[in-house]
Amino acid sequence: MAPIRVALIGLSSSSPSWLSLAHLSYLLSARGQQKFQIVALQNSSLSAAEAAIKKYNFDPTVVKAYGSPEDLAKDENVDLVVSGTRVDVHYGNLKRLLEGWKATGKTAGKGVYSEWPLASNLQQVEELVALAKETGIKTAVGTQGWASPVVKKIGEVLKSGRVGKVLSSEVRLSGVTAEREVMQEKTEYFTRREVGGNMWSIGGGHLIDLLQSALGELTNVKSHFHIQRPLVPLKDSTTGTITRTVTSNTPDLLYVVGSLPASDTVQQNASLHLRMRRGPPFPGEPAFVWTLTGEKGEIRVSSKESVAIILGAGEVKIEIHDYQTDKVEEVEWKWEEWQEELPAPARNVGSVYEGVWEAWNEGISKEEGREKRYNDWEVAGRRHELLERLLVDNGF
């Protein structure tokens, strides 16, 4: 099979980013290069794209530079476009790209893999989802927590019947930002709802997707959101000095409660409870604790890192309490060999790329028999709808 030809939108030459740390690390790995080939970069200007080509030592005769999505859309040598910009830039780039493909009439075999969130607001998301459906392009979105071997190991334990059916599940998360009062200047946009990238839309979105992928789609959802610290001092990451103070209009404390559907591993109307709080946990406590209370035992997942499962970084412990013996046992989990060779941020993201490859080469997919390959934009639309509804319900 020929490699899938990839164009990257938003690869910066000036600073490390999620696109370089996670996506590029996989794409340039030996395994990644067997399946994908980078053939183009698009940035906010042609010169910015050319600077990135030089920064990452790409061959300019192979990797083309573009300064607009319209120009990128004209490149017939591109199969898959990966958008890794900040969330408020996704919509403009992706809409113009899809409209460019539509205008040429050459949408067959084209695909887009966008980072999460898909766009700044639900209206933009719905427009992109509809346009993708109209043009028939393949889509993927960067919600990759479901691909974590921790989540897969939990699935194995549940299917084994060891703890019986899940009666309830609870998640407590403290973190997302390192400090409870101050934010880095570069993450100031977390305080502005209109940007679309904040604790709830990013951290909450990833977590809600992970939980629903593991346990089923939530119903009867209720919530309470609150801004505990509306005034947020911003700190220069280099000097450590406070540069200014801004007023936040995004929640920093969130409670969500819902019901889970019946399945082979979950009781009908089992309860799910989520609490997210910005800032570090109480000293000595894990930043992330996820419990699954079953009929015969309880699973406890914990980590000192609040988003370890999603990012693939940090230590994560799985423990099982057997009610009958009253003993607690730690359950081992591990990455696949090819993932261990990658930097931590690239491991779960690499699974999404593997899924894209399989989906584009159905023979391989059927032979390997994977149940889930990646989330598409329709799934992203459902996640965005829930996130937006809860924000509106709470007056945001």
Language-model features and meaning:
Residues 12-15, 145-248:
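Predominantly a Rossmann-like dinucleotide-binding segment in NAD(P)-dependent oxidoreductases
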Residues 278-351:
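Glycine-enriched catalytic-core subsegment of oxygenase/oxidase enzymes
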Residues 1-59:
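N-terminal Rossmann-like dinucleotide-binding module
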Residues 202-311, 358-363:
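Contiguous beta-strand/loop segments that form the cofactor/metal-binding neighborhood of enzyme cores
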Residues 79-80, 86, 91-147, 161:
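Beta-strand-loop-alpha-helix segment that lines the small-molecule cofactor/substrate pocket
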Residues 2-3, 33, 42, 47, ...:
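C-terminal helix-rich "cap/oligomerization" subdomain common to oxidoreductases
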Residues 39, 63, 79, 110, ...:
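Conserved acidic residues
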Residues 63-76:
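Short acidic low-complexity segments
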